């Protein structure tokens, strides 16, 4: 029985919290057109992602992909760090 190939969902977002062990909170922003007024508005989603080596810092731009559930609220894992945050 041949299985259909699953499409891997990947998203890019900004790390807003790295206080948990091996977990980061990633803010995903998207623009949606308002159904009545036609204006584009920003919508955002916060996702928890698995960071095995604790390498992410707040402000990093990262790519994450969907995986099996790792915890109650964590079903995404870190793929790579696109851009490092500027050190202050």
From Swiss-Prot:
GO BP field: translation
Entry-linked InterPro entries: NA-bd_OB-fold, Ribosomal_uS17, Ribosomal_uS17_bact/chlr
Pfam families: Ribosomal_S17
Protein origin, superkingdom: Bacteria
A GO MF label: rRNA binding
Cellular component aspect of the GO annotation: cytosolic small ribosomal subunit
SUPFAM superfamilies: Nucleic acid-binding proteins
Keyword terms, alphabetized: Ribonucleoprotein, Ribosomal protein, RNA-binding, rRNA-binding
Physiological role: One of the primary rRNA binding proteins, it binds specifically to the 5'-end of 16S ribosomal RNA.
Subunit structure as annotated in this protein's UniProt entry: Part of the 30S ribosomal subunit.
Assigned protein family: Belongs to the universal ribosomal protein uS17 family.
Protein name, per record: Small ribosomal subunit protein uS17
Encoding gene (name): rpsQ
């Amino acid at each position: 029985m041949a299985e259909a190939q699953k499409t891997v969902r990947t998203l890019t977002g900004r790390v807003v919290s790295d206080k948990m062990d091996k977990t980061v909170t990633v803010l995903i922003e998207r623009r949606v057109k308002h159904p009545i007024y036609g204006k584009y508005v920003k919508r955002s989603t916060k996702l928890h992602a698995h960071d095995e080596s604790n390498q992410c810092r707040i402000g990093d731009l990262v790519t994450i992909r969907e995986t099996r559930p790792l915890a109650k609220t964590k079903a995404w894992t870190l793929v790579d760090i696109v851009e490092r945050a500027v050190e202050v």
